[in-house]
A protein has these predicted regions:
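Surface-exposed, charge/polar-rich loops and edge strands
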Residues: 1-386
Length: 386
């Protein structure tokens, strides 16, 4: 399929980009799309809108204060944006609990003012940041603090670039989901920002199953597509974790609804991991080409292969990496529904939505624009059912 980026663009006026969250999490509009039909409700109505026989899957990653501002003796301001952990481990949980030192791959603002091999210090907490190479920074500090504690002291929440304002007090709470747990994301899984504990409780009370997995959202989620051929776009690599119970529940499911594009990408990656296992490959790394090249197996074969592998290796939780790229032509293996906000024109997330609902994505976005929906991370919501 020859896809052109121009086919996934739309006009997004600046004043439609939500710069702040609504007063209450659930005070959002909800567009319902079901097999071509569109209706408009309030997000509070999500409880009745979700089919009872569904499994609702959330991404429980927690946004870390990934922006660190330091100054040289000359006064030059250097901003360090944490991307991925490097040492002592590439596993977020282990690095966040490390004491004394760690290394991260970073984006560095005003990098020309900070020479490789030199260090910056923050005396108030005895922090030293050493630029090891172009984009690797080593942090050293007193080992009575974990790196997580350190970030709480000095880091700032990394709001998306299109919000285009300084972090405010409300963002500490509102740019996290109420169920966030596993520290490691540098962007929020924003479809979940609308949910409250009360709404999740009501969903469970009506008999709908709820489950969690983890994808640590990377800064690559904001990377614009520049490649002439869409499939040539270099997809970002993200760390994912799934519990045995979640896989077992997927086997029992009637319908699976992903809360957000990150949950959807994790679920679909899980299927392809099972397909790899059936084919004799146990490396949990899903490349962007895998879904378009691997031999197909049934969903049951895939999930059972994963459970069997977990039995053999004595694991109740599996982790891997995914750079899955979902665009029109992709055949969904696990997801029957998607709860999601409204995304940037020409982004990989628009392509994912277009893959899920087809050409109707344009109708959905036109409806949202003409009904004064708020767009992007702090914007309104939609429930899309196939």
């Amino acid at each position: 399929m020859d896809l052109k980026l121009d086919d996934f663009l739309y006009d997004l006026p600046e004043d439609r980009i939500a710069k702040h969250p609504p007063k209450n999490r659930e005070d959002s509009k909800l567009l319902l799309y079901n097999k071509g039909n569109i209706s408009h409700q309030s997000f509070k109505d999500i409880v009745t809108a979700i089919p009872v026989d569904s499994l609702l899957v959330f991404n429980n990653t927690k946004v870390i204060p990934a922006r660190i501002i330091l100054h040289k003796d000359s006064g030059a301001r250097i901003e360090i944006f944490l991307l991925e952990p490097v040492q002592p481990s590439k596993v977020h949980e282990e690095v966040m609990n490390s004491k004394g030192s760690c290394q991260w791959e970073c984006m560095i603002g005003n990098a020309k003012k900070w020479k490789i091999g030199s260090s910056l210090t923050l005396d108030s907490i005895s922090l030293q940041a050493i630029r090891i190479s172009t984009n690797i920074v080593e942090f050293q500090w007193k080992d009575d603090l974990t790196f997580s504690d350190l970030l709480t002291e000095i880091g700032k929440i990394p709001l998306p670039p299109y919000i285009n304002r300084e972090v405010e007090k409300e963002d500490q709470d509102r740019y996290q989901t109420v169920y966030s747990k596993e520290k490691g994301a540098v962007a929020a899984p924003t479809a979940g920002l609308h949910f409250t504990d009360e709404i999740i409780g009501k969903i469970k009370a009506k008999g709908t199953s709820v489950d969690y997995l983890t994808l640590h959202v990377s800064a690559g989620t904001f990377q614009p597509i520049k490649a002439e051929k869409i499939s040539d776009h270099p997809m970002h690599n993200e760390q994912i974790w799934i519990d045995r119970t979640t896989i077992e529940n997927l086997l029992k499911r009637e319908k699976t609804i992903a809360v957000g594009t990150t949950a959807m990408r994790t679920l679909e990656s899980l299927y392809w991991y099972g397909a790899k296992l059936v084919g004799g490959n146990n490396e949990f790394f899903i490349t962007k080409e895998d879904p378009y090249q691997l031999e197909l197996v049934t969903l049951e074969e895939s999930l059972k292969a994963i459970l069997e592998f977990m039995d053999q290796s004595g694991k109740n939780r599996i982790g891997g990496q995914t750079e899955i790229f979902i665009y029109p032509g992709y055949d969904f293996k696990i997801c029957d529904g998607l709860i999601t906000n409204y995304h940037l024109p020409g982004s990989t997330l628009i392509l994912l939505v277009a893959a899920f609902v087809g050409e109707d994505w344009k109708k959905i976005y036109e409806e949202a624009l003409s009904n004064n929906y708020r767009f992007l991370s702090y914007g309104d919501s939609s429930l899309l059912m196939k």
